[in-house]
Structures are given as structure tokens and as C-alpha cells.
Amino acid sequence: MRHSKFLVVSFLALMTLSFTACSSSDDDGGKGKIERPKYLSDAARYKITTQGSTWKSLELTEDGRYFIVYDGSVSGSSSQDNDDVIVSGSYEKKGNRYVLNTVGELTITANNNSYELLLTNKGKSLKFSAQKSGTLPSNKVNDELCRTWVFSKCYIVVKYDGKKVYNASSTSANELYDGFRSAINTPEYKDKLKLSQDKEEDIDGLRLLRTVTFTHAGSYYVTTTDGREDLMNYWKWINANELIIGFSENEDQTSVHDQAALKFDNGQLIMVDSQSKGREEVTITMEFQPVHTDR
């Protein structure tokens, strides 16, 4: 898949850590404390079972966002290359209905071991049968992670023989990429900084990164400034006590292709990638802020 290849390299690769680089959870005992999501009890992912539907799944998240995944291989999808298409936005609950911004009103009805989803918009309606995915329990660490995070800042340090070749932080991925690329391609270092050159494409990819959403259903979504690169994959805890998670393209998660260590600090989600090769060391620290429901 085009978008999976791009973002697994440019986002998840930056999250894959030397596990000594990051400590366990620390919410500073109140300052910057991460708020409890508004819709914890409503959050769920529904896998569409209606035969021939272009919809693969619909998920309502803990903090008031929805994600609809369309099957790009089914005729009628807007995908140009059979990639799944993801539509996302905010929702509100009104009585027993969910108002999905720009999409319509959703009613969910339990029917024995399955669910009926009815979506109405401007007098038109769509009806789906669905199965509900399993969910992780509500606890401190799951509830802190499972929400939408927006990329806010990145800090990059490149060292060679202990000397800093590049040392900068910015809220602008464009600014960081341009400075990083210029620093590692000087005549003095361009033939020495092999690790940095390997990471150049990853850092370039940060320019498209917008938000990351983790859910109790074990799915995660990445949205970008170019919606065609949005993706949905799966996550699970490798070690919840140490805040180490694994990522997979398969829902059963029998194989995990990447791992990441996380840290909560002053209301932020922080990910640090510190790698060395020979005399070269590259450290990338990424900061994410929680997105408010109305974003």
C-alpha cells in the first residue's frame, strides 16, 4: 500500500527506539495532567459485514472523533490505486444518536451478536450490519494514550565524533528538514554521515504528519496534510508497565514489525529515537499535544 509504505517509514520508523532513550510514564502529578476522554463508554470500532459495501469499518474514538475506512478495492471507491480511503472528523452524542460532522447522524442498534448501523443525511440513509471489535480495558495508561495527538515540535541532534553537526528544534517540520539537509550535506560531512542520510527521507515525511490517534480497539490512525496519505493500522502493548508498544498491519497482530517506547510528560506524548552508527549519533525527539474534541 502506498500510504502504508510512506508512513511506516516516516512516522513509525522515527518512533522505533533504543529503549534506553526514554523513561516510563510521568504525568507530573497534576500539572499538565491529561484529561479523561469525553466518550470513553461510546468508543468502539465496528467492522462492516454487509456484503458488497465500500465501507470496511467505522470507529468512534474516545475523544470525539470518527474514522470511516473505505475499501479501495471495491468499485465505487475514490481510491486511485486500491488503497483504503479514510474519512475522519469530529462527532457529538445527542441522546442515542451520534452526529458525525459532514457525514450525518448515526444510530447504532444491538442485534443479538451483531449491530445495525443507520446513517442518515439530508433525507438519505445508509444501513449496515457490523461486528464490534474487542476493546482494551479502561485504565490509567490506556486512557492516557487512547486519544488524538497532534504533532507539535521536533528536536534533532546530529553528532560526529562527539561534535554537534546539527542541533535544532522547531514546530515547523519544513524548517527542520531544510536545516538538517543543509547541515549533513556540507563538504566536510556529506561522505561521513551515512546514518543521517538514511534518515533524510523519514524527516522529510514529517512535513506531512498531522495527527496520530490511538484507540482502545487496538487501532491507530495517522492523518496528514495530504489526506491521500492517511492510514489505519494496529497497535498492542509489548510491555504496558514500561510503555512499550508494538505496531502491526494485521489485526490479529501475530507479527509486530515495529516497536516504540513512550513517555507522558506535562500533558504531552513524547517519543525519542536515538541511534548510533560508528562515530555518528542521531537523536530525534518528537512531541505531541492532545487534541481537544472540537478540533
Task: Please tell me what each predicted stretch does.
Residues 2, 23-24:
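Cys/His-rich metal-coordination motifs, chiefly Zn-binding "fingers/knuckles"
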Residues 17-21:
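C-terminal motif of bacterial Sec signal peptides marking the signal peptidase cleavage site
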Residues 1-9:
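Bacterial N-terminal signal peptides that target proteins for export
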Residues 25-86, 94-234, 238-295:
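Lipid interaction determinants
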